[in-house]
A protein has these predicted regions:
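Beta-strand-rich domain onsets/edges
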Residues: 25-52, 114-117, 207-218
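Short, acidic Ser/Thr/Gly-rich low-complexity loop/linker segments typical of extracellular
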Residues: 75-84, 163-164, 255-257
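Surface-exposed, proline-enriched loop/turn segments that connect beta strands in immunoglobulin-like
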Residues: 40-43, 73-74, 124-128, 206-210, ...
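Short amphipathic beta-strand segments in non-cytosolic proteins
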Residues: 60, 68-77, 156-159, 247-249
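Short, ordered, surface-exposed loop/turn motifs in non-cytosolic proteins
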Residues: 50-52, 61-72, 148-150, 230-231
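A short glycine/threonine-centered beta-strand motif
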Residues: 56-61, 133-146, 224-228
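Short, hydrophobic beta-strand segments
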Residues: 85-92, 172-178, 263-273
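Ser/Thr/Pro-rich low-complexity tracts
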Residues: 108-207, 274-276, 280-293
């Protein structure tokens, strides 16, 4: 599979430029160094005794094979050639934690009983109203397949990649062919399908001065939103606070201006010393009942 672009729309400004931070691909890769495996995608809801799929991303955002995942109940497994791993959820309901071996931090998942997860047909209970073209996003409901590849997700008539899954949750990467704007989304697996619903997909573009940042200099970074005239929430995070200060706090959330002509959100940094600064920007999108469902 051809390389895909960023999941989380993390925009990295390195002194003067914008570079894609996360790139995903499904083709087999050489196992990454332990320190390169950074992000564990574990379905937030799994079902006792039933299958689920997790995924691991490396430092460049690619799906990472050969990475060991350890669970708080003592179980462990490794991702396969696609950077994912199929596993059976523990029998005991409750919270379980997973972590990448050799990396700090852990991710939680709630184990529900089969009775709690049962439904006569596939249903969607929560999905984002807005997502970015390059971000992964989550869909919650019932009746999905635990094997990620058994789920068929289409967005605007294009196939999407299911990164992680359980009967109750999907983590989806939009197709590269998708254009900004509203799109219909369908989900099906094992001869079950959910009613079609809509998600607005936006493209985030950076407009910034390309000259080096100097100590005491104020620099405005403007994020342009394409695909909607609505105000959307963006979060900026300063990843190099010793080099520059993000005015307004760290992290800082801001609504875009909204509008048909120009939908923008400005962020300002102040140089503390000459050097490389890193600012990440991500869309903040709440989950809710899907539209058109």
């Amino acid at each position: 599979m051809a390389a895909r672009r960023k999941f989380f729309f993390v925009a990295w400004w390195i002194a003067s430029g914008l570079a894609p931070a996360l790139v995903a691909q499904q083709s087999p890769l050489a196992p990454p160094r332990p320190t390169a495996a950074r992000i564990l995608l574990l379905p937030r809801r799994i079902v006792s005794g039933e299958r689920a799929t997790l995924a691991v991303l490396d430092v460049n955002g690619r799906l990472a094979p050969g990475v060991t995942i350890r669970f708080s109940n003592g179980d462990h497994l490794s991702t396969d050639a696609t950077g994912r791993a199929l596993f059976v959820a523990p029998l005991n309901p409750g919270v379980i934690f997973g972590s990448i071996e050799g990396r700090p931090g852990r991710v939680s998942s709630m184990i529900l009983t089969p009775t709690e997860a049962s439904a006569p047909s596939m249903e969607i209970s929560a999905a984002p109203h807005v997502a970015t073209l390059t971000d992964r996003f989550e869909v919650f409901g019932k009746g999905f397949c635990g094997d990620a590849d058994a789920n068929h997700v289409t967005i605007g008539d294009h196939g999407a990649l299911v990164l992680a899954s359980s009967p109750l949750a999907l983590t989806v990467l939009p197709p590269t062919e998708l254009e900004p704007g509203p799109a219909k989304l369908t989900v099906s697996c094992a001869k079950r399908d959910a009613p079609e619903f809509s998600v607005v997909f936006v493209e985030l573009e950076l407009a910034a001065d390309a000259s080096p940042l100097r100590r005491g200099e104020h620099r405005t970074l403007t994020v342009r939103v394409r695909g909607t005239s609505e105000k959307i929430s963006l979060e900026a995070r300063n990843l190099a606070p010793d080099v520059a200060e993000l005015e307004g706090g760290n992290p800082l959330r801001r609504l875009s201006s909204g509008g048909d002509q120009e939908n923008v959100a400005p962020f300002e940094v102040v140089g503390k010393k000459n050097g490389t600064f890193l600012i990440s920007i991500r869309l903040v999108s709440a989950l809710g009942r899907p539209e058109g469902h």
